[in-house]
Every structure is written in C-alpha cells, then in structure tokens.
Amino acid sequence: MKFFAAAALFIAGVLAAPSPNAANSVTPLCNPGLYSNAQCCAVDVLGVADLNCATPPGVVNNAAEFQAACAKIGQEARCCVLPVLGQDVLCETPLGL
C-alpha cells in the first residue's frame, strides 16, 4: 500500500513538471510553406508586390519582436513567397499580428 502511494506521488510530480522544450519554444513568424520568408518591406502594392524589402535586423523570436524590429527601421513586417533583389512577390501579414 505504501509503495503504491509513493509511486503515485512520484508519477504525479513527474507529470506536473514542465517540459524543458516548453520554455524555449519559438512561435513561427510566418506560415510554413509558400509565405515562409520573413521580410521588412517599405511599400506594399495590394499584397501582390512589396518594395524595398530586407530580412529583419537582429534576432526576432515572435511576431511582436518582428513588428518592432521592422518598425525601428521604418518598414512593415511581411511574410512573402519570393524575395528577389529587394522586391518581394505575394506577401501577407505575419502570424499573430
């Protein structure tokens, strides 16, 4: 009987502990798939083309940091399909914004 109680307490403690990956998990900035390129763009033309785009400066871990990093350089956070020489094709708003 004591063994069962001790085992139940041990198992309950293990299950209640947070997993080590939960604290370090990073939410994706953009949808996986087509719109997977995080970009800071100056001009959006109806979501079809974005002009003067570049990768976000520094390290960004979530949508709020992505938006703040782009705003700091006077640009807008976007997720695009095809970045080519600062012009991006088919862009959308990042996840979480």
Curated annotation (Swiss-Prot):
Name of the gene: HFB2-3
The UniProt record lists the keyword Disulfide bond: yes
InterPro entries to which the protein is assigned, alphabetical: Cerato-ulmin_hydrophobin (IPR010636), Hydrophobin_sf (IPR036686)
GO cellular component, one term: extracellular region
Keywords per UniProt: Cell wall, Disulfide bond, Secreted, Signal
Protein name per its UniProtKB record: Class II hydrophobin 3
Protein family per UniProt: Belongs to the cerato-ulmin hydrophobin family.
Primary role: Aerial growth, conidiation, and dispersal of filamentous fungi in the environment rely upon a capability of their secreting small amphipathic proteins called hydrophobins (HPBs) with low sequence identity. Class I can self-assemble into an outermost layer of rodlet bundles on aerial cell surfaces, conferring cellular hydrophobicity that supports fungal growth, development and dispersal; whereas Class II form highly ordered films at water-air interfaces through intermolecular interactions but contribute nothing to the rodlet structure.
Induction, per UniProt: Expression is highly induced in the presence of root and stem powder of Shanxin poplar, and slightly induced under carbon or nitrogen starvation.
Subunit relationships: Homodimer. Homodimers further self-assemble to form highly ordered films at water-air interfaces through intermolecular interactions.
Disulfide bridge partners, by residue number: C30-C79, C40-C70, C41-C53, C80-C91
Phylogenetic lineage: Eukaryota, Fungi, Dikarya, Ascomycota, Pezizomycotina
Leader sequence residues: 1-16
